[in-house]
Amino acid sequence: MLDKTTIDGQEDIVTHPVPKRLLNSAECPTPHVNSLEQYKSMWKESVEQPEKFFGNLGRELLSWSKPFETVQYGSFEAGDVAWFLEGELNASYNCVDRHAFKNPDKIAIIHEGDEPDQVRRITYGELLREVCRMANVLKGLGVRKGDPVAIYMPMIPETIVAILACARIGAIHSVVFAGFSAEILRDRVVDCATRVVLTSDEGRRGGKNIATKCIVDEALRDYENHSVEHVLVFRRTGSPVPWVQGRDVWWHEEMAKARTFCSPEPMSAEDPLFLLYTSGSTGTPKGILHTTGGYLLGVAATVKYIFDYQENDIYACMADIGWVTGHSYIVYGPLTLGATTVLFESTPTYPNPSRFWQLIEKHKITQFYTAPTAIRALQRLGDQWLDNIDMSSLRVLGSVGEPINREAWDWYNEKVGKGRCAVVDTYWQTETGSIIVSPLPGATPTKPGSATLPFFGIDPVLLDPTTGKELTATGQTGVLAIRKPRPSMARSVYNNHSRFVETYLKPYPGYYFTGDGALRDDDGYIWIRGRVDDVINVSGHRLSTSEIESALVNHEAVAESAVVGAHDDLTGQCIHAFVSLKPHIQIADGLEKVLTLQVRKTIGPFAAPRRIYIVSDHPKTRSGKIMRRILRKIVNGEHDQLGDISTLADPSIVAVLINKVQRLNTEANIYI
């Protein structure tokens, strides 16, 4: 009999035990952590004796050119956290050299291009030579230790080469997602004052060419006071592109002239490794700064334990390198451990919705990591796309980016994993650098919708948002904060440390403020409730949008929902919900009323939406995130303040939604 948990009045949330196959099968290696008791013992040591725990882990997983002596220094209160003082290492050496020396013919990168037959396999020996060449090219362009380098490139191996070449010479890479507009790219280039931009002639995605070089040109042309002196261009498609003499240089020409050896620069553990600008923010760009030693240890440890990486595994993360998930779980995490990492250039549905599943079968992938949005989208397209595809190589299925709803979790577990794989619903942020709450495949019973238990070194607390006091009783929802520093957490905002302190350390002194709300259940499992600023105040009731969205998605007809607040003269705000339906579900008369009653029943009458819009899709970024900011502007009539929508997967959906909202708001029978 499976245990059940009651959350939000739902009494049928099943606790899934660790799959027996992972613990008692000759086909699976023994997990690194193979019992809940072992996890609890390791976690206890990691928070009570962090110097001992992370000192040992740092020596085990990383190679140091100069040993560290002081494991941890500083505090959240002082805003001066540092790890592995006196120690020196190089991220490129840890990701490439040491594996190339040991096993040069092992595959480091499997690149599956936009077309399924475009597959490249790059060994660690080959990767070392390419990284050294690019490092020498960057030196030839005047890049030195501590200089920022902007990278605006598609999902190709050369992007990884560029990242590791920067790390090799001590340059600070700033990767900008290659779907961002020229305006956003310009903001980031100006903020970090880079002199060198790396790009490609074009990118490829979903059967379409993407004009990356033209976007770079536009970003630099529209702002004459930028600092850029060189644009290095990789030839991806061979299409003709505009050329600025004296500034633009061809990648292949410079690489042909470069030596195949470049000594790695010794870096202090606290030297900057990269900047990553948070997406969707307004105002001045916020460049999150990660340092070398702590970050590298965090991503290596989470790949080892959360994805249970074993020798000869094939690890696949479907994120874009332009996001932190790509940095941590395509590049640095797997390569630090000497893994084979899969780099995927296309989309889940090109040329058909079997693409992900065929990818798993073709490359015999053992760990697969993607977003709930992708899972839900593929679920909506039907199970037939998984037919006759052998995915028996899988051991771990990962979810990232947002809490995964129960129905999607069940489908992922049963249809993709066949009930034989661990499902790890991971919670973390750009600022944390690596996963901070997650199950461990061989140790943690799982509950659909819960990220479960904290990873090593993470001491989570729930705080009363008004008083800042810790909430210790189970079943309470509060602000999620972290009590103690951890190696991989960001150290600052680039050139603006006071902003870092004000945003993350000052709201609740002595804690790191995640900005998310969470609930802890009777088993100590953590349920992420969404951003605490995603709160709607209706007649004095503070309502979490994620809770209302969960109530809507629990209806059998609903695939996805997004809830935002609209101004109301009487109640302050009212609730508007955008709902998309599952395939083959017909819009029935009275469905809005049924969904409203569902919310009233799940949360209460005060949470009932004022408007429910049945829509074909939501405005989403190319990484699958629903842009609620845009929906908020639409329902409040601020159509002239939408900002840049070029990053959306389908910008045309915005006009469709505006028309629908305007039309329904003028009809007498819009709301039941």
From Swiss-Prot:
Its EC number is 6.2.1.1. The keyword ATP-binding applies. The keyword ATP-binding applies. Induction: By acetate. GO terms for cellular component: cytosol. ATP binds at G401, E402, P403, D425, T426, Y427, W428, Q429, T430, D516, R531, R542. One of its GO terms (molecular function) is acetate-CoA ligase activity. GO terms for biological process: acetyl-CoA biosynthetic process from acetate. It comes from the Eukaryota. CoA binds at R205, G206, G207, K208, T325, S539, R600. It catalyses: acetate + ATP + CoA = acetyl-CoA + AMP + diphosphate. Keywords: ATP-binding, Ligase, Nucleotide-binding. InterPro entries: Ac_CoA_lig, ACAS_N, AMP-bd_C, AMP-bd_C_sf, AMP-binding_CS, AMP-dep_synth/lig_dom, ANL_N_sf. It holds the Pfam family ACAS_N. Belongs to the ATP-dependent AMP-binding enzyme family. This is Acetyl-coenzyme A synthetase.
